[in-house]
A protein has these predicted regions:
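A short alpha-helix-loop-beta-strand transition element characteristic
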Residues: 61-65, 69, 77-92, 158-166, ...
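Beta1/beta-strand and adjacent pyrophosphate-binding region of the FAD-binding site
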Residues: 2-13
């Protein structure tokens, strides 16, 4: 009887699992319900689709995120290798072109002779059949698990599913940004040094890697922005969503409602920047 491992879910975890198993000359059946069926969060047909932020966080070896990525490079992680190949400027972080990234992962897995990609939704009956046949199964469907499969997992584990309300990452067109006000700069690298003249500082920041675009605000502008944000129309919940917030991935409008200064001491803190128009912190 031919030996193989079933991997259910062709997202980030499932794609990496399939690659690592195949690398060890073990056959894989990789099940992905797209393009037959899409979850409300999915939009393209490729494997390893990035549905939230395109940032894999820091590349620096001075923090845990960077060290973990370097270890994954040493261990020949498919995802990190392709992330490096499809990287876009992001300062000291590793961010990717989400379309190129998922397309390249799909190409790598499709050409692997040890991997069979099956575009089919796994439901309760199919999973039970795998279990009855004593097949090895890796379930890597993550937070976008279909309802049919989620019910079966709940029965097997005896636990209700976990849940949190995720925030979508907005995409802003560069053409819509006024660069008479906005400026490029990485936090702490863009800031004027005490021993620099204005001319030396401006020359240095002009030659910096253009990774992040910053939009400075004065007090009146910030207060107007804050009021617009907390009173803005919000996306209506889908019938499968509940507004249960995870602190590590919080929608900005919910964070703002905790207080007017919350953003100023959080993601919008001006520390590490100087506005090139005035050579001082916004």
């Amino acid at each position: 009887m031919e030996k193989y491992i079933n991997v259910i879910g062709g997202g980030l975890a499932g794609a990496e699992a399939a690659y690592q198993i195949a690398k060890r000359n073990i056959k894989v059946k990789l099940y992905e319900m797209k393009p037959t069926k899409f979850s409300p969060a999915h939009s393209n047909e490729n494997l390893a689709e990035i549905v939230c932020s395109n940032s894999f966080k820091s590349n620096l070896h001075t923090n845990a995120c960077g060290v973990l990525k370097e270890e994954l490079r040493i261990l020949d992680s498919l995802l990190i290798r392709i992330a490096d190949e499809t990287a876009v400027p992001a300062g000291q972080a590793l961010a990717v072109d989400r379309e190129k990234f998922s397309k390249r992962v799909t190409e790598e897995l499709e050409k692997n002779s040890f991997i069979e990609i099956i575009n089919k939704e796994i439901d309760e009956e199919l999973l039970q059949k795998m279990i009855d046949n004593n097949e090895t199964v890796i379930i890597a469907t993550g937070p976008l698990t279909s309802d049919k499969l989620a019910k079966k997992i709940s029965k097997i584990t005896g636990n209700e599913k976990l849940y949190f309300y995720d925030a979508a990452a907005p995409i802003v067109s560069k053409e819509s940004i006024d660069f008479n006000i906005a400026f490029y700069g990485n936090r702490y690298e863009q800031e004027k040094k005490k021993d620099e003249s204005i001319e030396e500082w401006k020359k240095r920041i002009e030659n910096q890697e253009k990774s992040y675009i910053n939009l400075p605000m004065n007090k009146d502008e910030y207060e107007k922005f804050y009021n617009e944000l907390v009173n803005a129309e919000v996306v209506e919940l889908h019938n499968f969503e509940k507004r249960e917030i995870f602190e590590g991935c919080m929608p900005i409008e919910i964070m703002a409602k905790r207080g007017k200064d919350t953003l100023r001491y959080g993601p919008l803190k001006p520390v590490g920047f100087d506005d090139p128009r005035y050579a001082k912190r916004p």
